[in-house]
């Protein structure tokens, strides 16, 4: 972090871009804010408040004030054009939580300290250091499961940096849903599901049970690449473990069936009696109760707002960022004409970056809040320097 904090390339003064030359020059905060305000007011007067859009990237999610104030700003304007990095890697996880628990902010995390069996699907914490969970020294924690007699099984098409250290089940890309349904099928067929717990804690299990029975491992093996006998053993071992957790991350969210996969990951824990249980998937106690804050801030939503193009649902208030370029170039009420980004680089991280890059040049106003010049904000009219975590009050979320 010292390298970032003191990086000579870091943006520490407001920068204004000359559209004719593309060059940035240093300006005062007063000049930048005055011009941004005037141009934003002109755009809103001409095309309405719903012509303003905002995208914030992954680092912004780790600052409680940033997330709340960005959404508050957009709510104050009355614009639905709120986008985040979540639609690239985790929105379907949140959507599954909304369907299962009634809130997209309720996400179970593996109890690494107490589990005896960890099944990871599409996760590579040796590189990511964990995602949607906070686990300091996660490598040591994972090895600790094995050292105390437990198992860590990594389901991934690639023998990832994490998979090399533990048991690896290679699965064909985008077939996780078939594999997980087959595991549920085994639990039902062999009477390994905790039916009493399911009857007590869930509604709709009968429909899931019936669905799962249509995916026996012998019929899905050709699609998933996982031999039927191996998958049956895996399902039995999961059910037979003293305390088991199932954890999916980015890889499990990037296929065509990401929401279903996230739903099935939690259903496996439900079916084996390991959801909301020590050593299983637990709902943590963060410094900030995210589900309560999200509800109070009006972010605890799924499908409350639909996108102008395609009618796609919001997740936690955010629309799919893959729509940005089209929303900027498609005429009509609600076309984005003024745009803000913060802590993000959607040209690099979102689908069809070249189209977005071209669309940015046609805006009336583009303002970026960041600590670096990047592939996206090099098209901005202004780059306003932001803080690192060492320079502001914050709480870990």
Question: Where do the model's predicted regions map?
Answer:
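A cross-kingdom feature strongest in bacterial/archaeal respiratory oxidoreductases
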Residues: 51, 117-164, 172, 305-397
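Gly-rich Lys/Arg/Thr-decorated short loops/hinges at beta-loop-alpha junctions or inter-strand turns
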Residues: 10-21, 118-124, 208-219, 303-309, ...
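Flexible, glycine/charged-enriched surface loops at secondary-structure junctions
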Residues: 47-51, 193-198, 245, 276-283
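N-terminal leader/propeptide and maturation segments of large enzyme subunits in energy/redox metabolism
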Residues: 15-26, 185, 189-228
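A glycine-rich, hydrophobic/aromatic-adjacent loop/helix-cap motif
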Residues: 229, 238-333
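Generic, well-ordered alpha-helical scaffold segments in large soluble proteins
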Residues: 35, 39-43, 72-76, 145-148, ...
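Conserved short loop/turn motifs at secondary-structure junctions
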Residues: 55-62, 223-226, 249-256, 288, ...
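N-terminal export/assembly segments and adjacent metallocofactor-ligating motifs
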Residues: 1-190, 227
